[in-house]
């Protein structure tokens, strides 16, 4: 129910609830302000992708973002497939780019966590290689805790070219790399920056890391050789956020 509350009402195309949910939450739909179709518990379980559904399901309109949205430069939140712009007054302020770039990320939980963390850390958007996990994967959606409805994202077929494009626009690109010569918290992220995070098992592909302006590493103690992709992304994004709060 919490995630449904986070969805902008104009994006909800259809809403379904189970008989049990309606019985336990008689005032919920009225307070939500969206009409819902009631399904029997059996039918609801059939259409749901979880074993123990909570009893509420929304069909939501997909939105298309642009690179300007990812960089925090666009006054419009996003672009719908119809081509119409959905205005969001809260997003009219142009922000300093703070981008997370994901190369062949595969785990839905990791991507969802990165969305949630990116919003909390003040990132402007997420750039993904076309072979990364689908943002609309149900597991991704749930693990974002609603951040997917607010954090711009954009898939690209040629990630190395996209990284070079960021650099050409004055956005310094940092590749999280085990062989990074620079320590992450000794860099300056107060200007436009982008952090490159690689695949869970293989890290960044060479053709991607070679395009970065700088290779950085996160010092670690003990016998740990690397961090989870979502954890590494969180460390870097929050360091940028910390520096920008000064």
Predicted regions, residues:
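N-terminal positively charged helical leader segments and presequences
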Residues: 1-51, 79, 83-87, 92
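Short, acidic/turn-prone active-site loops that include or flank metal/cofactor-
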Residues: 20-22, 41-44, 131-133, 200-202, ...
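Glycine/charged-rich beta-loop-alpha catalytic/anionic-binding loops adjacent to active sites
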Residues: 70-72, 95-101, 211-220
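Structured adenosyl-cofactor binding patch, chiefly the S-adenosyl-L-methionine
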Residues: 117-121, 135, 140-148, 206-246
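Active-site/ligand-binding-proximal alpha/beta "capping" segment
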Residues: 174-224
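Acidic/glycine-rich phosphate/pyrophosphate-binding loops and surrounding catalytic core
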Residues: 49, 56, 60-73, 91-94, ...
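General small-molecule cofactor/ligand-binding pocket signal
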Residues: 36-40, 154, 216
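RNA substrate-binding interface of SAM-dependent RNA methyltransferases
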Residues: 1-10, 17, 73, 79, ...
């Amino acid at each position: 129910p919490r995630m449904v509350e986070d969805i902008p009402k104009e994006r909800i195309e259809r809403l379904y609830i189970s008989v049990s949910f309606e019985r336990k939450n008689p005032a919920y739909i009225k307070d939500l302000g969206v009409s819902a179709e009631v399904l029997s518990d059996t039918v609801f379980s059939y259409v749901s992708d979880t074993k123990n559904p909570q009893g509420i399901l929304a069909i939501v309109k997909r939105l298309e973002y642009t690179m300007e949205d990812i960089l925090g430069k666009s006054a419009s939140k996003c672009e719908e497939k119809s081509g119409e712009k959905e205005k969001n007054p809260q997003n009219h302020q142009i922000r300093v780019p703070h981008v997370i770039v994901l190369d062949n990320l595969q785990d839905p939980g990791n991507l969802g966590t990165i969305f949630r963390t990116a919003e909390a850390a003040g990132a402007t958007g997420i750039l993904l290689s076309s072979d990364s996990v689908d943002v609309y994967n149900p597991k991704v959606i749930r693990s974002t805790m609603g951040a997917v409805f607010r954090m711009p994202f954009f898939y690209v077929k040629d990630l190395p070219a996209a990284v070079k494009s960021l650099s050409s626009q004055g956005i310094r690109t940092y590749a999280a790399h085990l062989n990074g010569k620079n320590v992450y918290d000794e860099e300056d992220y107060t200007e436009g920056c982008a952090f490159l995070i690689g695949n869970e098992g293989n890290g960044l592909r060479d053709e991607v890391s070679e395009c970065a302006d700088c290779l950085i590493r996160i010092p670690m103690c003990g016998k740990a050789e690397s961090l989870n992709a979502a954890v590494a992304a969180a460390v870097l994004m929050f360091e940028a956020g910390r520096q920008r709060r000064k």
